[in-house]
Amino acid sequence: MKLKKTLTYQHHAYSFLSDNTNEVLENPKEILFVKTPLNEKYAPLIAEKNLAILDFNELKNYFDFKIKIVGITGTNGKTTTASLMYSLLLDLNKKTALLGTRGFFIDDKHIKEKGLTTPTLLELYSDLEEAIRLKCEYFIMEVSSHAIVQKRIAGLDFALKILTNITSDHLDFHQNIENYRDAKNSFFKDEGLKVINRDETNALFNPINARTYALDKKAHLNVQAFSLNPSISASLCYQHDLRDPNLKETALIHSPLLGRYNLYNILAGVLGVKLLTQLPLETIAPLLENFYGVKGRLEIVHSKPLVVVDFAHTTDGMQQVFESFKNQKITALFGAGGDRDKTKRPKMGAIASCYAHQIILTSDNPRSENEEDIIKDILKGINNSSKVIVEKDRKKAILNALENLKDDEVLLILGKGDENIQIFKDKTIFFSDQEVVKDYYLNLKQG
């Protein structure tokens, strides 16, 4: 991308930065090439022309980011935790930007549509400049494992880093679980302020300036008691110094969110906001009632019978959703993304068979893969095939599930969340799980 930026480099004045060699070669007098891990193989094309090359590690020297950047990483919970913090800070009258899977937002305005969880380095710098121009105090961003490995966050000084959890995902990119864990944990090696899920056994971090939250272990922010029925209520206790039990803050919270895993997201978000603002816990706690969650994350699309859409596309993510409804009769409808980690497919089938009384296997985003082959991979993990229905057409699968759903049952439509497209080998179509459900019940009502 091309970023408007006036700077002098190697005694030459430039008006733009770009990580695209074609853009630079078209106008080398005005555009300075920025070399990153993603485009370094093209750098010789620039060098052959004797043009200047700015290494991505030097980029930060030409920007003055007077804004508190918060980076949130983890297998699950990034989007909800980031959105929760954004909501809390806005309610506290703090001018805040949010960047992540759902797009770029500033002060409740949708600035840019969704793209990568973490954009390219120049896009990120561009978004930061826009947030600063609009006088934001905080910049909340999701940080993917890809972005960490590809150094898409190079040069940023984080005011706070947050870890939600580490399970297994993106093994098509990282090759194995060890590399994936190492990528996540590498984000927390420095001595900066960090918030860590103390119950996460895979977490490795520098203990200097680490603050923790947990349900099961002793941590800086703990839950003394909680209820998940029908939504989250809890008594929280915060200790700034774990060695001094007399210095405590407590607060009662009530949240419209569902499920134990959302209680973890709440703990991460509340602790993050407390550390950033230094406000009392009892000032932050009441604001949780204003946050109703994120579209496509445990989203109730219809209440009776209960139909829920969720982004869960990993074994751990699916289990957390299932746990939220384990006392109900579950129909689970899902597929798996094509051209992605194949090893998780049978595991997804296995976890669904543990919780669901009926499983409907369908397409997700098959991309270049054959839909039937993806479904066969999922079936390998399901012992009882009698509870399985296969319908590769996702719309038909959802409609069939709705037609057979009883009032005391719950339909969990998993994998795509708030996505509004479906990607095939030769086409991309508009598709929304929510719209299919809403249209069905609207037509039913109209007769």
Swiss-Prot record:
Chain residues that bind meso-2,6-diaminopimelate: R340, D364, N365, P366, R367, G415, E419
Location (main, coarse): cytoplasm
Catalyzed reaction equations: UDP-N-acetyl-alpha-D-muramoyl-L-alanyl-D-glutamate + meso-2,6-diaminopimelate + ATP = UDP-N-acetyl-alpha-D-muramoyl-L-alanyl-gamma-D-glutamyl-meso-2,6-diaminopimelate + ADP + phosphate + H(+)
Post-translational modification N6-carboxylysine, affected residues: K184
Cofactor dependence: Mg(2+)
GO MF, one annotated term: magnesium ion binding
InterPro entries: Folylpolyglutamate_synth_CS, Mur-like_cat_sf, Mur_ligase_C, Mur_ligase_C_dom_sf, Mur_ligase_cen, UDP-N-AcMur-Glu-dNH2Pim_ligase
Gene Ontology CC, one term: cytoplasm
Protein family membership: Belongs to the MurCDEF family. MurE subfamily.
Name listed for the protein in its UniProt record: UDP-N-acetylmuramoyl-L-alanyl-D-glutamate--2,6-diaminopimelate ligase
The organism of origin for this protein: Helicobacter pylori (strain J99 / ATCC 700824) (Campylobacter pylori J99)
